[in-house]
Amino acid sequence: FPGGGFTSADHEKFSEMRRALANAGFVVAAAEYRVVPDKFPAILEDAKSAVRYLRAHAEEYGIDPDRIGVLGDSAGGYLSQMTGVTNGEKQFDKGDWLNVSSDVQAAVTIYGLSDLTTIGEGFGPEIDKVHESPASTEALLVNGPAFRTYPGASIMADRKAALAASPLGHVDGSEPPFLILHGALDPLVSPTQSAKLYRALKAKNVDAEYVLVDNAQHGDLPWFQKPVIERVVNWFVKVLKPVKAEESEGAVL
């Protein structure tokens, strides 16, 4: 799932990672999804539709339907998290191919968001004010834009709704294995977002790994270099365990 701050979802992003996964034997798909002004859960409904599509067409694409993983960065990382933590939550299954499951067997999140109410945590009061604005993208995602008599609302206006739209609001111990990566110098999404997710998953005895990448920011060069890409590919190989070439391969979305 490509990042884009909930305002874009260009499926052509992160081609280096996708090629590396394909070279490792995975079937790789890149999915676009609805962005603001569409409100949550549209974004998650689209992600789950993409998973169901791949599972429904597994034979056609040579996919093992029992071994599907998700990967995303930034807003796409949030979406990868949400897809993983909502395994079995049927209320988010809308659209086609409803006869197949949208559950995934592995999830990787790269500088993703786990708590929409604390994206700028630790960055100081000026950044806090930005995220408290009704015009922040997370507020638009959860509450929608101002329109006619509706003035819009801060992400803090309805904490219950914000939590329902946040991965941390769904962790219950039934999650698949997670690989969580974040840049130590990220100036946009606080690394505490990933640390919180890791702690929540481990508290429920979920198989989770957390990697804080030194000298990495948000979407800068370290994320497109060999060490990070190999870490992700090797983790998927370990968790999804690709089989012989003549058999069905796992898939990464």
For each feature predicted by the language model, list its residue ranges.
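Short beta-strand/loop motif that positions the catalytic acidic residue
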Residues: 174, 179-182, 186
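Primarily recognizes the serine-hydrolase "nucleophile elbow" in alpha/beta-hydrolase
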Residues: 24, 49-127
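Short alpha-helix in the alpha/beta-hydrolase fold that links the catalytic acid
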Residues: 13, 167, 176, 190-203
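Catalytic histidine neighborhood in serine/cysteine hydrolases
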Residues: 202-219
